[in-house]
Amino acid sequence: MAETTNTPETSHRKELIGLVVSTKMQKTIVVQVERQKSHAMYGRVISRRKRFYAHDEEQTAHIGDYVRIEETRPLSKLKRWKLAEVLRRSALAPEVQEAAS
């Protein structure tokens, strides 16, 4: 009889790292993800940006934070991502961010 080992369940969901650019909605953040790709004909490296709406249940992320988001089921018309963790906090103080909002 073959012996089976219990391996930890790995997530097959996509993950992205980006910058929080807006926290004006309740429990929702807007994350800007930048990627670089090579131009097909000329070979020059081009930066491309895309914005994703992500669910932030505890409202822990602030503008300027670098966060990791992961794919999830559709939560609304635009939200298909959720906040996994805050990687690096912004240099701005939370009081300044609240005044800017």
UniProtKB/Swiss-Prot annotation:
InterPro entries: NA-bd_OB-fold, Ribosomal_uS17, Ribosomal_uS17_bact/chlr, Ribosomal_uS17_CS
Keyword Secreted: no
GO CC list: cytosolic small ribosomal subunit
This protein's UniProt keywords: Ribonucleoprotein, Ribosomal protein, RNA-binding, rRNA-binding
GO-annotated molecular function: rRNA binding; structural constituent of ribosome
Segments passing through the bilayer: none
GO BP field: translation
Role according to the record: One of the primary rRNA binding proteins, it binds specifically to the 5'-end of 16S ribosomal RNA.
Subunit-structure text: Part of the 30S ribosomal subunit.
Protein family according to the UniProt entry: Belongs to the universal ribosomal protein uS17 family.
PANTHER family: 40S RIBOSOMAL PROTEIN S11 FAMILY MEMBER (PTHR10744), SMALL RIBOSOMAL SUBUNIT PROTEIN US17M (PTHR10744:SF1)
Name listed for the protein in its UniProt record: Small ribosomal subunit protein uS17
